[in-house]
């Protein structure tokens, strides 16, 4: 079923995140997470004819939401290649970049993609359906220790070793091919009152590994730091502690580790100044309208 932009994904913190860009009407902007196009449309509504917006999405499904506007270019690519694409288009600097790091509702609600444990689906989880290992490949091929590390680091699950052991045992009986197969192998390890939360963390961990999300985020933020001109804004919405920590560290220190370097005179060398010292979160009305926004945090920084 073809979805409208409105049903593909509801934009989170729409006004707040675009306001955070401090739009210059003739500027060059990037939305690295196009999805349903909500944030891109809002940015375009504030631009003049001589401005331009480049929007990225690695999922070809998002192309159905492309905006017919001469000031708009859709790039069907992972945002980790931001710098390469800007070089391709002859863009040397940016006035602002927006990222909404949440998974589109389209992905959670599409039964064929394997992102949600609500459906019995092929265990896929690839944002880009044309490339890379599927979640099933990882679950069936990775060593037990590697699986345990994924569930511990990306899902923050304390029983990660037991989960990995259960999966390895299950796959010796038959390949784990669907979300139902996957859940059947690990469900006995979860307490009933925490089952949904822990299963969500497990699916999150596997999705992050499938799509190399942490590495891609670090590469994109590094490129953004280089491309943003002085006064340019970085507006990023995060949804879990792992990605939020990386964004926070880059904005405060200029690197994912949060290590502030000093110049010859002992002065801190940081590329950004924070626009909002406290994170911005959706108000009660937005959370009620869009429950998937509840964990969202918006951070905004300005290039020095």
Named regions from a protein language model:
Residues 1-304:
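S-adenosyl-L-methionine-dependent methyltransferase catalytic core, i.e., the SAM/SAH-binding region
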């Amino acid at each position: 079923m073809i979805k409208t932009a409105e049903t593909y994904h509801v934009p989170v913190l729409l006004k707040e995140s675009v306001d955070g860009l401090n739009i210059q009407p003739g500027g060059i902007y990037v939305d690295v997470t196009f999805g349903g196009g909500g944030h891109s449309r809002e940015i375009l509504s504030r631009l003049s004819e001589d401005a331009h917006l480049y929007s990225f999405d690695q999922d070809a499904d998002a192309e159905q939401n492309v905006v017919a506007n001469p000031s708009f270019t859709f790039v069907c690519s992972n945002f980790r290649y931001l710098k390469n694409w800007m070089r391709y288009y002859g863009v040397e600097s940016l006035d602002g970049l927006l990222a909404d790091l949440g998974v589109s509702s389209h992905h959670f609600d599409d039964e064929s993609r394997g992102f949600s444990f609500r459906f019995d689906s092929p265990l896929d989880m690839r944002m880009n359906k044309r490339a890379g290992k599927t979640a099933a490949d990882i679950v069936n091929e990775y060593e037990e220790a590697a699986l345990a590390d994924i569930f511990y680091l990306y899902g923050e699950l304390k029983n990660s070793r037991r989960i990995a052991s259960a999966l390895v045992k299950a796959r010796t009986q038959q390949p784990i091919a669907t979300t139902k197969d996957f859940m059947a192998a690990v469900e006995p390890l979860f307490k009933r009152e925490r089952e949904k939360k822990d299963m969500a963390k497990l699916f999150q961990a596997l999705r992050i590994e499938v799509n190399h999300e942490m590495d891609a985020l670090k590469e994109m933020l590094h490129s953004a730091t280089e491309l943003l001109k002085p006064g340019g804004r970085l507006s990023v919405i995060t949804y879990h502690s792992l990605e939020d920590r990386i964004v926070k560290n880059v904005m405060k220190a200029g690197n994912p580790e949060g290590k502030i370097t000093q110049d010859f005179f002992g002065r801190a060398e940081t590329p950004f100044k924070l626009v909002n010292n406290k994170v911005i979160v959706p108000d009660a009305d937005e959370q009620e309208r869009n429950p998937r926004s509840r964990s969202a945090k918006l951070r905004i920084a300005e290039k020095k």
